[in-house]
Amino acid sequence: MEDIQTNAELKSTQEQSVPAESAAVLNDYSLTKSHEMENVDSGEGPANEDEDIGDDSMKVKDEYSERDENVLKSEPMGNAEEPEIPYSYSREYNEYENIKLERHVVSFDSSRPTSGKMNCDVCGLSCISFNVLMVHKRSHTGERPFQCNQCGASFTQKGNLLRHIKLHTGEKPFKCHLCNYACQRRDALTGHLRTHSVEKPYKCEFCGRSYKQRSSLEEHKERCRTFLQSTDPGDTASAEARHIKAEMGSERALVLDRLASNVAKRKSSMPQKFIGEKRHCFDVNYNSSYMYEKESELIQTRMMDQAINNAISYLGAEALRPLVQTPPAPTSEMVPVISSMYPIALTRAEMSNGAPQELEKKSIHLPEKSVPSERGLSPNNSGHDSTDTDSNHEERQNHIYQQNHMVLSRARNGMPLLKEVPRSYELLKPPPICPRDSVKVINKEGEVMDVYRCDHCRVLFLDYVMFTIHMGCHGFRDPFECNMCGYRSHDRYEFSSHIARGEHRALLK
């Protein structure tokens, strides 16, 4: 009976406390069910605190939860005072949140552009975050909050200060596992590791060359021809390159011309070999394979052997017949030398069996006794002795001049041609040999070429540089004095032999 009465009293007590407790629950949703059970147990008295801990308390909570739901469902909707409390509280809270959100949006939109970055109000620089913007603003304000306690250096960022402190401590935390290299920064170690690896990740897509560093690839693209040609829309670059090459070729030709003129101006320089152009077609039969292939040979010899040998050969031949000299030796120079004392116009003639055919010439009536029939036209077969005196040559020359009347008594520079009249030595460039109607040298194109004459050796030159080099061998005081060693010759034959043999070299030593 006592248990039944106790349960009945408990039920009546719970029914009376439901309206008050329901109002408290509706007013404060933050209270837990344990607090609600404490309020329920408070009506029971302190003697029942120990009894509530157990299965009975769980039953009470379940009954309370079911009854609470029934009360909320059975609550009439017409009573507007009780449900207005939570609704009005939530409205005030939402209004407060809206105010805070509006303030946040205004402050955020004022510094953030439409692209999602934050702009500096001083210079307008866009930053990706607020922290980056604050660090940037320190560059305007001069603020450096991070200071080194050892040397007093200040920095705008903490990372820079930590990196600076490593300089004092000597700490190098990033070490290479392949060598003894150590550094303070991770990116430096990454770049160092590429030196050990064979991998070259940066590759030129135009020529295929690969590099370990991006900077090396950029430097390569600046001079990569394939890349430069691909970047140009047209062939302007190639045309410009061809134009530059053409200019370089012309400049090279000018430099060679200057070098040739400088060599000609050196009066004390040794004579140099001259390689004749193959396009020249003269009335001589010569082999073009004798030309020098190495320029060093031309510089080392530096002597005009052919010009002197030709002078000795044709001056020792029969003086009363026209003569065209061929190179006597393979090392001789490919410059045909024509005697200036024979004013005969030469024309092109085909060679057959090594012997020249009849040459077309002007009507020159020479004495038959001066042209022996037993002697051929070849200069090597000329039987005239080289010991003939100059007077014999002069007499024969005067005999030819008187019969033909084709050569002037004086050269164009006013100097007499005969040896008995004193002659002065001049290094000035003489005009071409006597008038073109007396002696003609025709090239392959049929053009008449200029011929330059040495009055002392009576040698003709087709090239002015070779003529100048030859004239540099003559002395100033005496034309038959060697300008290189001072040796004095009695006549032009001895002088030519001295130059050809190079006797002055022994004297210099």
UniProtKB/Swiss-Prot annotation:
It is found in: Nucleus; Cytoplasm. The modification Phosphothreonine is found at residue 326. It holds the Pfam family zf-C2H2. Expressed most strongly in peripheral blood leukocytes, the spleen, and the thymus. The modification Phosphoserine is found at residues 22, 42, 378. GO terms for molecular function: DNA-binding transcription activator activity, RNA polymerase II-specific; DNA-binding transcription factor activity; histone deacetylase binding; identical protein binding; promoter-specific chromatin binding; protein heterodimerization activity; protein homodimerization activity; RNA polymerase II cis-regulatory region sequence-specific DNA binding. Keywords: B-cell activation, Cytoplasm, Disease variant, DNA-binding, Isopeptide bond, Metal-binding, Nucleus, Phosphoprotein, Repeat, Transcription, Transcription regulation, Ubl conjugation, Zinc, Zinc-finger. A zinc finger (C2H2-type) spans 118-140, 146-168, 174-196, 202-224, 452-474, 480-504. SMART domains: ZnF_C2H2. Residues 1-86, 364-394 are annotated as: Disordered. Gene3D superfamilies: Classic Zinc Finger. Residues 56-72, 385-394 have a biased composition (Basic and acidic residues). InterPro entries: Ikaros_C2H2-ZF, Znf_C2H2_sf, Znf_C2H2_type. Induction: Up-regulated by TGFB1 and 2,3,7,8-tetrachlorodibenzo-p-dioxin (TCDD) in activated AHR T-cells. GO terms for cellular component: cytoplasm; cytosol; nucleoplasm; nucleus. Belongs to the Ikaros C2H2-type zinc-finger protein family. Homodimer. Heterodimer with other IKAROS family members. Interacts with IKZF4 and IKZF5. Interacts with IKZF1. Interacts with HRAS. Interacts with FOXP3; this interaction may be required for silencing target genes and regulating the suppressive activity of FOXP3-positive regulatory T-cells (Treg). Interacts with BCL21L isoform Bcl-X(L); this interaction blocks the anti-apoptotic role of BCL21L. Associates with histone deacetylase complexes containing HDAC1, MTA2 and SIN3A. C2H2-type 5 and C2H2-type 6 mediate homodimerization and heterodimerization. It is linked to Immunodeficiency 84: An autosomal recessive immunologic disorder characterized by recurrent sinopulmonary infections from childhood associated with low levels of B cells and impaired early B-cell development. There may also be variable T-cell abnormalities. Patients have increased susceptibility to infection with Epstein-Barr virus and a propensity for the development of lymphoma in adulthood. Transcription factor that plays an important role in the regulation of lymphocyte differentiation. Plays an essential role in regulation of B-cell differentiation, proliferation and maturation to an effector state. Involved in regulating BCL2 expression and controlling apoptosis in T-cells in an IL2-dependent manner. This is Zinc finger protein Aiolos.
